[in-house]
């Protein structure tokens, strides 16, 4: 699952996806930093081999923001082996270079890539690649990839072929309609900005499917504040965009996936939005 990362906690009950899979609640949460076990928002997370890995994130450990609480950011990196058990045993495997949240994570077969993010004082353009090395004490090795041209947070990211895409979010603190690409087979060439149509999209949902890139939802704040329900499909071979029909609720109403997540499952997208309902469209419809 990609994250543009929302909340890291699961729903309180099992969720059934007809014809696809069952989503089960897993027990266990990292507790290597004071306040972390309360649950965090905006963490970096993904699956690496037989392990889940999560890092960073933020919360209000002392009191909620409505009561004047102060948001705290974290930098711990935690891993847990995935097996047949319903419990996860987390071990702290290292730390990020800085406290961070609200970035994006992309999972590759042999590594996880953490992109951008922010904390209470800074916004980041950094791109970090994590992989396993059994010769290391923690097992984790971190490599630095070319940074984004701008600091970006609250965006989404996905891998399409050998190209990494980062879309939307806040660019240097301002809601953005930017998209950047990085070829992982030639990453020394750096990032390229890809023309992106339409309004800015902060906290969009982005995924790749059948050789195309899809983006849904997102919001923009300020005087022209709005929440997007429609989607867009990008064809990398032609560089063209097409409008995609909005996903619908069970009542047939347009649904925004802002702050949610999606994952490709065969030839469908499983789309998750932040009121914990799952959508399984038969295929994205152009």
Residue ranges, per PLM feature:
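Terminal low-complexity, poorly structured segments
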Residues: 1-3, 244
């Amino acid at each position: 699952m990609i994250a543009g990362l929302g909340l890291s906690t699961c729903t309180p009950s099992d969720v059934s996806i007809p014809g696809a899979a069952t989503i089960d609640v897993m027990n266990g949460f990292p507790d290597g930093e004071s306040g972390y076990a309360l649950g965090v928002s905006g963490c970096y997370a993904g699956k690496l081999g037989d392990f889940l890995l999560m890092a960073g994130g933020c919360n209000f450990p002392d009191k909620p923001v409505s009561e004047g609480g102060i948001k705290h950011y974290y930098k711990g990196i935690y891993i847990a082996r995935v097996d047949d058990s319903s419990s996860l045993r987390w071990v702290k495997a290292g730390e990020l270079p800085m406290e961070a949240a609200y970035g994006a994570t992309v999972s590759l077969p042999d590594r996880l890539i953490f992109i951008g993010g922010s904390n209470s004082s800074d916004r980041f353009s950094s791109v970090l690649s994590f992989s396993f090395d059994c010769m290391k004490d923690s097992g984790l090795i971190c490599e630095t990839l070319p940074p984004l041209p701008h600091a970006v947070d609250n965006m989404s990211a996905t891998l399409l072929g050998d190209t990494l895409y980062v879309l939307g979010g806040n660019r240097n603190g301002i809601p953005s309609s930017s998209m950047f690409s990085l070829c992982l087979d030639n990453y020394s060439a750096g990032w390229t900005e890809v023309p992106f149509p339409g309004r800015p999209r902060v906290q969009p949902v982005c995924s790749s499917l059948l050789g195309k890139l899809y983006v849904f939802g997102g919001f923009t704040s300020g005087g022209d504040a709005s929440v997007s329900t429609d989607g867009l499909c990008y064809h990398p071979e032609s560089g063209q965009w097409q409008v995609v029909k909005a996903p619908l609720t069970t009542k047939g109403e347009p649904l925004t996936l802002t702050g949610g997540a999606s994952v490709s499952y065969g030839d469908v997208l499983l789309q998750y939005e932040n009121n914990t309902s799952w959508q399984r469209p038969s295929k994205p419809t152009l």
